[in-house]
Regions:
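Short, flexible loop segments at boundaries between secondary-structure elements
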Residues: 142-159, 289-303
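Hydrophobic residues at beta-strand termini and immediately following loops
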Residues: 74-76, 153, 164, 294
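Glycine/threonine-rich beta-strand-loop-alpha-helix active-site module
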Residues: 126-151
Length: 362
């Protein structure tokens, strides 16, 4: 089985619902050792109110105690926290932050391997330690290291959409798009496609900022002055990227099938078409960090909380994606650490005399 997976959520939204529905499938605990960071009491409340399938939760004090083939939970949230389904409350935000902080601490010391987060509410989680627009920015600070930037990738099957600008007002987008930033995002994207998705020579499509890709400068100069130079600059650094493509035609005629990744300039440009294609089972992956973190591509959904109608498909896919990426990273590390060994095994080992995998001094 694969190492521990950590999960946390907003207590008034659909977080516990999608987690419990996903983990009620006993096969999941055979793939990994799930550790929920939250409250067993609140989980039990959600299960009862929503009449969810029974999940036996094994309460543990620390991640190291997690038992295989069972669903573990670490109580890091005050049991007395009041659950008010469908409401955004400060208590819910506090609970979400405590769970996130506990899990991040365990990730940092290697007690858990991957992080799958259920949706948080961006408003109620804000406090003195957490003043970020969302998970991605918080995790970037925790795991980005020196100058390491996170990249948000929305994925479903072979469609992977990444963003140059994320959670900022639309009015600021044009001024925030620079050659340097596009090149940096292309390099992170390229590296992620190689190590996290096992693609040897990734092909990345770059979307234009303006309608009709700027129409030769009639509808804006960003393509000629910023995006095209960025594509050329990235090529010198070993990134195969193409474009800029006008976004409407690009998605309309399914050109995206020909690429391993799509780099959009701003949030809605990339996410509107993505969610049209993958609303129920899309996954949000935070690339560029030292740890693996995924989440469902949907929000807290207060409007349907407590009705047992939320689909857990996106959360299940987020869990599978985290496990796949974790395994791919291990394979990538092994392949790049010792390329000879990989070649040797790939070609089969019937000639025992010539063993390239032996160290000189063995």
């Amino acid at each position: 089985g694969l190492g521990d997976v950590y999960k946390r959520q907003d207590i008034n939204g659909i977080g516990y619902e999608v987690i419990l529905k996903t983990l009620s499938d006993t096969r999941i605990a055979e793939l990994c050792t799930p550790v929920i960071y939250g409250s067993s009491k609140i989980a039990a409340y959600h299960r009862k109110v929503l009449e969810l399938p029974a999940v036996n939760l094994s309460i543990i004090a620390q991640a190291e105690d997690a038992g295989a083939n069972r669903v573990n939970i670490i109580n890091c949230v005050d049991d007395e926290t009041k659950v008010e389904l469908c409401q955004s409350t400060t208590a819910a935000g506090e609970a979400a932050y405590l769970a996130l902080e506990a899990a991040v601490t365990d990730l940092k010391r290697g007690a858990v391997d991957v992080l799958v987060t259920a949706p948080i509410n961006k408003h109620n989680i804000q406090n003195e330690q957490f003043h970020f627009p969302g998970h991605t920015e918080y995790l970037e600070q925790c795991f980005g290291g020196l100058g390491k930037k996170a990249l948000m990738i929305l994925m479903k099957d072979n469609l992977r959409v990444a963003l140059v600008t994320g959670h900022i007002p639309l009015a600021q987008v044009a001024s925030k798009i620079t050659v340097e930033d596009i090149v940096s995002k292309l390099r992170i994207f390229n590296q992620s496609l190689r190590q996290d998705f096992g693609i040897v020579r990734p092909r990345i499509a770059v979307l234009a900022l303006n309608p009709h890709a700027g129409d030769a400068g009639l509808l804006g100069k960003e393509e000629e002055e910023i995006i095209i130079p960025a594509i050329q600059e990235a090529e010198k650094k070993g990134v195969m990227s193409f474009g800029p493509y006008a976004a409407d035609g690009f998605f309309g005629s399914q050109v995206y099938d020909k690429f391993d990744g799509v780099l959009a300039m701003y949030h809605d440009q990339g996410l509107a078409p993505f969610k049209t294609l993958a609303m129920d089972d899309g996954v949000n992956y935070t690339a560029g960090l030292s740890i693996v973190r995924t989440s469902p591509a949907h929000g807290t959904a207060y409007d349907i909380a407590g009705q047992n109608v939320a689909s857990e498909e996106s959360f299940r896919q987020a869990l599978y994606a985290a496990l796949d990426i974790y395994r791919n990273r291990i394979r990538y590390r092994e392949a790049t650490a010792n390329p000879l060994r990989k070649q040797y095994f790939d070609k089969g080992g019937d000639n025992e005399k010539l063993d390239l995998t032996k160290e000189e001094d063995e």
